[in-house]
Amino acid sequence: MINYLKSFFLYEIVRGMALTLKYFFKPKVTINYPYEKSPVSPRFKGEHALRRYENGEERCIACKLCEAICPAQAIVIEADEREDGSRRTTRYDIDMTKCIYCGLCQAACPVDAIVEGPNFEFASLTHTALIYDKERLLQNGDRWEQALASKLHKDYEYR
């Protein structure tokens, strides 16, 4: 009988309208995305980049720790030895469609060569555009170097 009276007086509709009025006058939390962007944490893991030293030499020493630790097996590295005995990468590919953005590659790197930068807008229409080669990763590093250095400095106390 009580259920019948509640439905007769449209109790559910009144409760729904009360809830609507409750939130109607609160400030909006929606962000108009292409024109407004929400703040990004300094520990955000975005698009990958390879960094260089100040003299322009790439940091990667071809230790392959990032390739070994990657749980998604998204990183492929090939290396050659130089005349001075040091190793440098000849091929450094990351398949961004396999990457799970866990940050283990960045944590494993002893020289901070591979980092996950602040960029999150790298959508593509083709699969091949999401397979990053060494040149693209170095371009990302050059483009985002100031932000990457700032991010690593802020994150230093947690390492």
Curated annotation (Swiss-Prot):
Enzyme class: translocase
Location in the cell: Cell inner membrane
Chief location category: membrane
Source organism of the structure: Rickettsia massiliae (strain Mtu5)
Catalyzed reaction equations: a quinone + NADH + 5 H(+)(in) = a quinol + NAD(+) + 4 H(+)(out)
Record gene name: nuoI
Protein name according to UniProt: NADH-quinone oxidoreductase subunit I
Family recorded in the similarity comment: Belongs to the complex I 23 kDa subunit family.
Every 4Fe-4S ferredoxin-type domain range: 51-80, 90-119
Residue sites binding [4Fe-4S] cluster 2 per the record: C70, C99, C102, C105
